[in-house]
Amino acid sequence: MSSLRLLASAARRATTHVAYTRRGYAEISDKLKLSLALPHKAIFSSQDVVQVNIPAESGDMGILSSHVPSIEPLRPGVVEVVEDSGSQKWFVSGGFATVHPNNRLTINVVEAAPLEDFSIEAIRANLQEANKVAAGSGSEADKMEAQIEAEVYEALQHALAK
């Protein structure tokens, strides 16, 4: 065999034994990027968190990274933000949560405050007052407003009792 044929034969055998590396998927983040915003300020702005629990109208939901995209209306209740260092609880009056396909969660609410800022005694007193106005002889608008207040105070009282 000529040296050229021997070299060509060896080159063919060498290329058939090359290990091909398989192409894999991109790394998926195990964190969720949370944005929690009020009309006048942002509480969280694209902050990495482990999990967020929300009071959706359809029931309480826990949201992790890679959650199915959805839009959820929120009822008055507690939004719990779980981070590596612990968790924070915020009482929200209602709003919307949008789970985006790229591990982002946007929560827009009208009002929010840290749960520890509330006093159970003040909540009970305000709930009694709201129930009194709702059952009173005032205008229909006043009664409806008081009923909405009572619903929010009941949700807040329930959240503080946990």
From Swiss-Prot:
Q: What is this protein called?
A: ATP synthase subunit delta, mitochondrial
Q: Which family does it belong to?
A: Belongs to the ATPase epsilon chain family.
Cite the record's note on assembly: F-type ATPases have 2 components, CF(1) - the catalytic core - and CF(0) - the membrane proton channel. CF(1) has five subunits: alpha(3), beta(3), gamma(1), delta(1), epsilon(1). CF(0) has three main subunits: a, b and c.
Q: Which organism is it from?
A: Agaricus bisporus (White button mushroom)
**Membrane spanning residue stretches:** none
What keyword terms does UniProt attach to this protein? ATP synthesis, CF(1), Hydrogen ion transport, Ion transport, Membrane, Mitochondrion, Mitochondrion inner membrane, Transit peptide, Transport
The UniProt entry lists the main location of this chain as: mitochondrion
Looking up CDD domains in the UniProt record yields: F1-ATPase_delta (cd12152)
Q: Does the keyword Ribosomal protein apply?
A: no
Q: Which GO terms describe its molecular function?
A: proton-transporting ATP synthase activity, rotational mechanism
Quote the transit peptide annotation as a residue range. Answer: 1-25
Instruction: Please describe what this protein does.
Output: Mitochondrial membrane ATP synthase (F(1)F(0) ATP synthase or Complex V) produces ATP from ADP in the presence of a proton gradient across the membrane which is generated by electron transport complexes of the respiratory chain. F-type ATPases consist of two structural domains, F(1) - containing the extramembraneous catalytic core, and F(0) - containing the membrane proton channel, linked together by a central stalk and a peripheral stalk. During catalysis, ATP turnover in the catalytic domain of F(1) is coupled via a rotary mechanism of the central stalk subunits to proton translocation.
Please provide, in alphabetical order, the Gene Ontology terms of the cellular component aspect for this entry: mitochondrial inner membrane; proton-transporting ATP synthase complex
Tell me which domain of life the UniProt entry assigns to the organism this sequence originates from. Answer: Eukaryota
**Which Pfam families does the entry mention?**
ATP-synt_DE_N
Where in or outside the cell it occurs: the entry states: Mitochondrion; Mitochondrion inner membrane
Which InterPro entries does the record match to this protein? ATP_synth_F1_dsu/esu (IPR001469), ATP_synth_F1_dsu/esu_N (IPR020546), ATPsynth_dsu/esu_N (IPR036771)
